[in-house]
Amino acid sequence: MTHQTHAYHMVNPSPWPLTGALSALLMTSGLIMWFHFNSTTLLMLGLTTNMLTMYQWWRDVIRESTFQGHHTPTVQKGLRYGMILFIISEVLFFTGFFWAFYHSSLAPTPELGGCWPPTGIHPLNPLEVPLLNTSVLLASGVSITWAHHSLMEGNRNHMLQALFITIALGVYFTLLQASEYYEAPFTISDGVYGSTFFVATGFHGLHVIIGSTFLIVCFFRQLKFHFTSNHHFGFEAAAWYWHFVDVVWLFLYVSIYWWGS
């Protein structure tokens, strides 16, 4: 490390990949225990260790990038490629869910009554809460772009305001989605309609929670003056992720809520 003559970051040995893998094992085992034996002990242990791992791992990355200067332009380029590939992998995840939905809805089987939505299913009105959710996410896309432009112009206060608005809209979306699930006239066990609806929208909702967490971390980092107009990849990655979540929701709204109803 002392005599390094290249622009790459040679990472020091870290325990977090190991603790992260163990926490993932605990979480998946805990889910099975919860589903089959109604015991949440293992799941809670897995979630706790996962949160602790993420906190400490991200803390180390922030130290390396912001305070130690290890994230050179070459390293940032690699991180950009990594984030792009990660988002592409997420696109493929959602492609699978849309495939399942269209496979079931374009050629409904006789067991479903030969129609879509299946006989006995009362779909949600796309012009009520789903339309409000769409407006909320589109507004958050505008505010995150405002935050990015403010950062590039060196306007710290506007950046913080825009970021706070984006986080608030993300939390509002999650609350609206939770209320919609609570009041839905069908469940995940109501045949293929219930399973495709809840898996696709639930997976998207999980991504909104992850994206909101990402933005909250960026908000606190900006409070501590971590970002500059030419060194802010953490925020840029969060913004990319948030726009991805926006676009996926538009496809979900048009496919499942509007056309599918």
From Swiss-Prot:
Gene3D superfamilies: 1.10.287.70, Cytochrome c oxidase, subunit III, four-helix bundle (1.20.120.80). One of its GO terms (biological process) is respiratory chain complex IV assembly. Pfam families: COX3 (PF00510). Signal peptide: none annotated. InterPro entries: Cyt_c/ubiquinol_Oxase_su3 (IPR024791), Cyt_c_oxase_su3_dom (IPR033945), Cyt_c_oxidase-like_su3 (IPR000298), Cyt_c_oxidase_su3-like_sf (IPR035973), Cyt_c_oxidase_su3_a-hlx (IPR013833). The chain crosses the membrane at residues 16-34, 41-66, 73-105, 129-152, 156-183, 191-223, 233-256. Residues 35-40, 106-128, 184-190, 257-261 are mitochondrial intermembrane. Residues 1-15, 67-72, 153-155, 224-232 are mitochondrial matrix. Keywords: Membrane, Mitochondrion, Mitochondrion inner membrane, Translocase, Transmembrane, Transmembrane helix. One of its GO terms (cellular component) is respiratory chain complex IV. Component of the cytochrome c oxidase, the last enzyme in the mitochondrial electron transport chain which drives oxidative phosphorylation. The respiratory chain contains 3 multisubunit complexes succinate dehydrogenase (complex II, CII), ubiquinol-cytochrome c oxidoreductase (cytochrome b-c1 complex, complex III, CIII) and cytochrome c oxidase (complex IV, CIV), that cooperate to transfer electrons derived from NADH and succinate to molecular oxygen, creating an electrochemical gradient over the inner membrane that drives transmembrane transport and the ATP synthase. Component of the cytochrome c oxidase (complex IV, CIV), a multisubunit enzyme composed of 14 subunits. The complex is composed of a catalytic core of 3 subunits MT-CO1, MT-CO2 and MT-CO3, encoded in the mitochondrial DNA, and 11 supernumerary subunits COX4I, COX5A, COX5B, COX6A, COX6B, COX6C, COX7A, COX7B, COX7C, COX8 and NDUFA4, which are encoded in the nuclear genome. Belongs to the cytochrome c oxidase subunit 3 family. This is Cytochrome c oxidase subunit 3. It comes from Ourebia ourebi (Oribi).
